[in-house]
Amino acid sequence: MRTAIVILNWNTRDFLERFLPGLIRSVKSIEGAEVIVADNASTDGSVKLMEEKFPEVRTIAFEKNHGFTGGYNKAFEEIVTKAGSDAPEYFVLINSDIEVSDGWLEPMIGWMDSHPECGACAPKLHSWYKRDTFEYAGAAGGLIDCFGYPFCRGRILGKVEKDMGQYDHMNPEVFWASGACLMVRSRVFADLGGLDERFFAHMEEIDLCWRMQLAGYTICIIPDSTIYHVGGGTLPATSPFKLFLNYRNDLLMLDNNLAKTYALLVYNQFSPHEDIAAEKGIHAAEKTIRTRMLMDGLSAMVYLLTFKFESFKAVLNAHREYRKMRKGINKETVMTFLKNSKGIEIKHIYGRWIVLQSLLHRKEIFAGIHENDFFKF
């Protein structure tokens, strides 16, 4: 096996029945490609469906729900262990609510084969409902602002663009790509410890992409590949639990990566001394995280004043859990990173607050954002 395409399923039997046949057909002629379903202890008959309608597809059935992060980590570990010397070179994480197009996989394999510096790549993500329009979760590749707010080429806040090929000829490198469909180099995934299981679900792919870049790899979008995403297959957009995960995990992601990123900026542009750069990077990261938490507090007040009490509580609980779960920033770890950081570049971090730029300055499409406003690390 060269490429393992893995659906992590939890109670999405209907999506499997609808979209799995097309996925199987799409990779049938690709040598070394195998579709695998890992089930997170579903209670809707998903495993029975696999046994009865798709006996040719390998199914890994977990006894409990490990979440998106733990489920994929455990699935990949089992696949690698069973494969032995034939372990896959690439893993594809793909949601059950994805409809693939013909020839979606080949361009990604070709890109990864010819670009060993690429740690992960993804197709363009279109809406399943509006097929000429980007989909919220990933569009044409993700960026992030200096406070950790993600946005995309083709989607800023809630404004989603039609795909008219406007981003097809841009530099394919982005900051993150959606976990709805993400091809990762298995060796890199393993070296980085996989997905951070503290996240459970949501934002974990952005954290992984950030860690890949800090390890010297790039993240790319492949415009010759397009898939169609239903979205909200596991948690609806209005779910307070989803809101909780997004707020908490964004802070965990900043805690994981921001100090190293700022220290790299100081080290490369101002002070080639690891200890000074590490101190300044940690100070800047801690200040940014405090500012982000104040911003979250403002959004919590908006929820309260608009009588969205469950959303208000979700933000408060997210901050409480973050304080319990954060690892903290270790100066020695940052210094060790800097000593081994030659050639590492972090791109596509927007130097302004994207929420303010969108709401006050009407920057609702990615083309309206100036390239000079991105940090150069």
Model features per residue range: what roles?
Residues 86-99:
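Short beta-strand-to-loop acidic/aromatic patch adjacent to the donor-nucleotide binding site
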Residues 32-41, 60-62:
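Short beta-strand/loop segment that forms part of the nucleotide-sugar
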Residues 98-149:
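Conserved donor NDP-sugar-binding/catalytic core segment of glycosyltransferases
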Residues 167-226:
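A short, conserved alpha-helix in the catalytic core of glycosyltransferases
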Residues 22, 39-48, 64:
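A conserved acidic beta->alpha catalytic loop
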Residues 6, 215-335, 343:
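Active-site-adjacent helix/loop segment of glycosyltransferases
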Residues 21-32:
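Short, acidic, metal-binding catalytic loop of nucleotide-sugar glycosyltransferases
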Residues 62-83, 107:
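Glycine-rich, basic loop-to-helix element that forms the pyrophosphate-binding segment
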